[in-house]
Curated annotation (Swiss-Prot):
Designated name of the protein: Endolytic peptidoglycan transglycosylase RlpA
PROSITE patterns tied to this protein: SPOR
Record GO terms (molecular function): lytic endotransglycosylase activity; peptidoglycan binding
Enzyme Commission number: 4.2.2.-
Alphabetical GO biological process terms: cell wall organization; peptidoglycan metabolic process
PANTHER family: ENDOLYTIC PEPTIDOGLYCAN TRANSGLYCOSYLASE RLPA
Amino acid sequence: MTLTRKTLFLLTAAFGIHSFQTASADAVVRAEKLHASANRSYKVAGKRYTPKNQVAEFTQTGNASWYGGRFHGRKTSGGERYDMNAFTAAHKTLPIPSYVRVTNTKNGKSVIVRVNDRGPFHGNRIIDVSKAAAQKLGFVNQGTAHVKIEQIVPGQSAPVAENKDIFIDLKSFGTEHEAQAYLNQAAQNLASSASNPNLSVEKRRYEYVVKMGPFASQERAAEAEAQARGMVRAVLTAG
């Protein structure tokens, strides 16, 4: 059964279940001819890089950053104009153009981007994503995030994102101290439940929210809500 927002509202009269998978569409994966010059060996700051000459399975973990304003409209290594509002990325050696799924390992959010540029060449960063991609991954304000990247081969199924973006909002508070106190009490109440979910405090614009999760699916989140009902007092928050 598909759980619509209305159905979830009825299921969670006290809790708010929300997902972050409703953001703008990712890059659409398609087979493309590799760019000749953008995939040649090159040197930056005395170090030589040799790009991959074919799209194949590849995974990598490390730090990601994003680039925006002052690069917007400039030419990329693939000869296109950089658009910070599109779902694109820069990588030192992945084929241009190619597609990867980028997953923020801290919050589980993911996005599919099209690699059309080279970089980043700063510190230990492995990928530069567009501002739009960084917004979807949830690290625009932080500037960097630890990520996992997975090469997508056209014609094959895209790697499935680990579903770590479904949470139940328990209650919101005006101060972090109040939220932490509530979290501690809720953790004690939920310790004996079958799901025994993780609890955390998230700072939002004007409040601190105690949330439970992540869960692998909306169905699993609804089950956890049913187990937790009566153990803690919750409020519905719009997702």
